[in-house]
Amino acid sequence: MNSPLIKVHSQKWSKEWTRLFLSKKHWICILDSPIDQKLVKECQRYPISELDRVTKNFYSKNNYENIMKKLVYLISCDYTNKNIKLIDGYHIQLVYVKKLLQQDFNNAIVLVNTAISWIEYAVAAKFELVENKHGHSLTRKIKKLSNDIDKYSKKDPKKTYLVELYQVSLCLDDLWDTNKQNFEDGRYNVGIGRHSIQHGRVDPRRYNAEIMEKLICLLYALVKLPEIEDVIK
C-alpha cells in the first residue's frame, strides 16, 4: 500500500494504523461504529502476527454476536432515507439472512452470492449508476475512486473519513479486479471476488464464515459512510 495515508498514519498501534493494517486483509473498521472501535482497541493489545486471528475471534465469539449486531443495524436502517444505499427488497433479504446465520453460520455457503449482490447495488447507488445505461462503468468508477483518494490524501491526509474510504476502496478494488480472478485457475483455486462469484466459477464449499463476515462488514461501512462527494471535494 503506497497511499499517502499510510505514510501519515505510520505510527504502529495508532487507531488509524490498526484500521489500515486490518484493511489489507479486507477487514473494514470505521470511526462511526462502537463495534469497530471495540475491535481496534482489542487489536492494539496484540502483536501484528496475531491481528487476523484476533479479528476472526472477535466476530465469531458468542455465536457471532458482533457480526449479528452489524446485521441488526442494517435491518433497522430507515430505507426511506435516500442516503441509505439499499432498497426494501434487500432489507427483506437481510432479515432472512440473519435468521439463517443465527440457525447455523455455515449457511454462508448459500448466502455469499446474495451478499455480493448487496455490495454491488450499494456501490452502484453510491456512484449513481443503478438506473443508468452506463452501469457497466462501475469498475472504472472504483478505480477512479482509488486515484481520487490518493490525490486528496496528498492535500489533506488527516481529513475525516479518508481512512475509511481508503479501506473500502482497497476492498472494492480487489473484489472487482478480474486479474485476481482467473477462471483458468479452476474452481478450487480461482480468486474469490465479484467476477468469479457472479459467474459461478467458485466451488461454493469455499464460501466460509470469514468471507460472509467480511462482506457484511463491507456493506455496513458502505451504508454508514457519508456520500463519496462529501468526503472527496
Task: Provide a role label for each language-model segment.
Residues K70-G89, S153, P157-T160, N179-F183:
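An acidic intrinsically disordered interaction segment
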Residues R19, R53, N57, N66-Y73, ...:
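Charged/polar, solvent-exposed surface patches and flexible loops
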Residues K24-W27, L31-L51, K56, L86, ...:
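Charge-enriched interaction surfaces
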Residues Q11, Q37, Q44, Q93, ...:
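Residue-identity detector for glutamine
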Residues M1-T80:
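Internal, Lys/Arg-enriched amphipathic helical interaction segments that engage polyanionic partners
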Residues N106-K233:
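Amphipathic, oligomerization/interface secondary-structure segments
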Residues T80-E120:
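A long, hydrophobic alpha-helical segment
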